[in-house]
C-alpha cells in the first residue's frame, strides 16, 4: 500500500515537472515570435524613412544604406 502511494506521488511530481517544462518552452517560442515581429516592424519603419540608396533620412545624422537608415554611416562615403 505504501509503495503504491509513493508511486502515485512520484507520478504526479513527474507530470507536474513535465508540464512546467513544456509551458516554459511555449513561452520562449512565443517570446521569440513577438521579438521577430517587433524587429521586422522596426526594420520597416527604418525603410519607410529612406528616400533611396544613400539618401538622407529625416534625422540629420542618419543616412540610408541599402534602404535602411543607420546612425553609423556617413552619407556618400
From Swiss-Prot:
GO terms under cellular component: extracellular region
One Gene Ontology term of the molecular function aspect: ion channel regulator activity
Propeptide residues, chain positions: 22-49
Region forming the signal peptide: 1-21
Subcellular location: Secreted
Principal cellular location given in the protein's record: secreted
Keyword entries, A-Z: Amidation, Disulfide bond, Ion channel impairing toxin, Knottin, Secreted, Signal, Toxin
Disulfide bonding pattern of the chain: 50-64, 57-69, 63-75
Domain of life the protein comes from: Eukaryota
Tissue and organ expression note: Expressed by the venom gland.
Modified residues (Lysine amide): 77
Domain notes: The presence of a 'disulfide through disulfide knot' structurally defines this protein as a knottin.
Family listed: Belongs to the neurotoxin 10 (Hwtx-1) family. 65 (Jztx-21) subfamily.
Chain's role: Probable ion channel inhibitor.
Protein name: U14-theraphotoxin-Cg1a 1
Amino acid at each position: 500500500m505504501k509503495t503504491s502511494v509513493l508511486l502515485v506521488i512520484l507520478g504526479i511530481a513527474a507530470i507536474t515537472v513535465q508540464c512546467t517544462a513544456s509551458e516554459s518552452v511555449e513561452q520562449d517560442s512565443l517570446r521569440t515570435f513577438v521579438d521577430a515581429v517587433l524587429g521586422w516592424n522596426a526594420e520597416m519603419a527604418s525603410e519607410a524613412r529612406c528616400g533611396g540608396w544613400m539618401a538622407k533620412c529625416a534625422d540629420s545624422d542618419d543616412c540610408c544604406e541599402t534602404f535602411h537608415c543607420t546612425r553609423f554611416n556617413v552619407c556618400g562615403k
